[in-house]
Amino acid sequence: MKLLVGILVAVCLHQYLLNADSNTKGWSEVLKGSECKPRPIVVPVSETHPELTSQRFNPPCVTLMRCGGCCNDESLECVPTEEVNVSMELLGASGSGSNGMQRLSFVEHKKCDCRPRFTTTPPTTTRPPRRRR
């Protein structure tokens, strides 16, 4: 029993010393933070609503959940598998001086997955057969 307690104390002390540097993130924390999942990103309103560029909005950017992160294979990419529309109220101002609250719709990513990358391949050209003389 004393041996078991001694081993347990040694393991705990070892873990404590490994984690003593608070600036170092452990492998599992790094892995979890890099996985393919929806994460908040700041997007300019003009990027999602280019048809409204004649207006200015306050705030000019919104925070949306978008897929991001890494896949464990270079041939895969992190893409949305489920999306949802969300409405947000923004203060809009046009060049004519009219101001008011506007409700705009944005797309958020609900679920993400690693899927094969679709690379564009150059078009193949076929030559007509050569005639023999």
UniProtKB/Swiss-Prot annotation:
Aminoacyl-tRNA synthetase found in the keyword field? no
According to the record, glycans are attached at N85
GO biological process annotation, one example: response to hypoxia
Q: Which domain of life is it from?
A: Viruses
Per UniProt, which keywords does this protein have? Disulfide bond, Glycoprotein, Growth factor, Mitogen, Secreted, Signal
> Any S-S bridges, and between which cysteines?
C36-C78, C67-C112, C71-C114
Q: What's the family?
A: Belongs to the PDGF/VEGF growth factor family.
Quaternary data:
Homodimer; disulfide-linked.
The name under which this protein is listed is: Vascular endothelial growth factor homolog
Lineage per the UniProt record: Viruses, Varidnaviria, Bamfordvirae, Nucleocytoviricota, Pokkesviricetes
